C-alpha cells in the first residue's frame, strides 16, 4: 500500500480564508480564476454563463471553506465545485444530450495512416491548430462537447461522467467516441 504525498502550496491562504481574511480570498481568486473560467467555458461555451458560474463557485467555495479538510489540493476541491456548478447550469438550460441515433456519421474510425510524425510544428503553427480545435469544439452539439470536455480536459472517467450527467457509462463512451469523430470532421472541413 502506497501513500500519496502532495504539497499544497496554498495551505496558508486556505487557513487564512478559514479565519475570514478577505485578502487571502482575493489571492486564491487571482490564482485560480483564469483556470476555472477555462473549465466553465469548456463545459458551457457561453461567456456570460461561465462568468456567472465562476463567481457562484468561488462564493460557494469560500462559504464552505471551513469544511475543506485539505485531503486534496484547494485547486482540486474548487474544480469539483466549478464542474458541478457548470453541469447544474446546463441542466437549468434544460438542454438534453444529443440522441446519437439521430446522426449518421458514416464509417467506424478515422484512418490515421496518413499521419507523418516527421512533420514538425512551430509555436505559431501549434497556436493556430489549438485555435482551430477550440473553434471546432464550439460547433459540437452540447452533449458531445460536455462529455468530450469532461473526459479529455477535466480527467473524469466514463463512470463519473455518467453519474454527473445522469447517463449510463456506455452512453458516455459512445458520446465521447462520436464527439471525437465529429470534431475531426469539423476540423478537416475548416478552411482558414
PLM features: what roles do these ranges have?
Residues 1-7, 16, 98-101, 132, ...:
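C-terminal edge and immediately downstream basic/flexible tail or linker adjoining helix-turn-helix-like DNA-binding
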Residues 131-146, 150-171:
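Helix-turn-helix DNA-binding module
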Residues 6-7, 96-123:
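Internal acidic/polar
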Residues 2-3, 18-27, 37-56, 169, ...:
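Short, charged helix-capping/linker segments at alpha-helix termini
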